[in-house]
Amino acid sequence: MVGRKGGYIRAMAEFEAERGIPATAERVFAVVSDLDRLPEWLPAPVDVRPTGEGEVHADVPERGVDADGTVRVRPEQLRVEWAHAPEYAGWLQVEHAEGARSTVLLHLSFLGDQPETHGGTPAADVRQWLDDALARLERVVTTNA
């Protein structure tokens, strides 16, 4: 999606991945909402660490990203939201599924003139990263949550 604002073109790209996990939604949410556990399931090259109440620091050396952002954990919705305004935002939603299973939806939005907003390899890398993150999350949840 491309929009015009203030005389320049502002691009936007959104990515989403979904995965069924053989664990309850509460068990999955316990892992994703524990910000100290982010390194266990977020794949390289992304390194995100909590720095304070509602704050995180992200380091993505491949992209030259070294930035602070915000994070909001919403237990009543089984949802975690984060952002580095105005270029980036994301959320993870855990939903109940049949039996002792859950579904996890991971969404990322890139705004502005970032490589991901132009498609090609950077966009494919984001899609792969989403799939890898959900696969790692499943391993963490099912082996040692």
Predicted regions and their residues:
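Hydrophobic-ligand-binding modules of eukaryotic lipid transfer/binding families
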Residues: V2-E16, D68, R101-T103, D125-D131, ...
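Hydrophobic ligand-binding cavity/cleft-lining segments
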Residues: V2-G52
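A broad, low-specificity signal marking well-ordered, structured residues that form hydrophobic/aromatic
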Residues: R10, V80, L92
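Generic structural detector for well-ordered beta-strands
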Residues: E18-P22, D59, R72, Q93
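Glycine-rich portal/gate segments that line the openings of hydrophobic small-molecule binding cavities
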Residues: P39-A89, R101, D132, V140-N144
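Beta-strand/loop substructures that line and gate deep hydrophobic ligand-binding cavities in soluble
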Residues: A83-A145
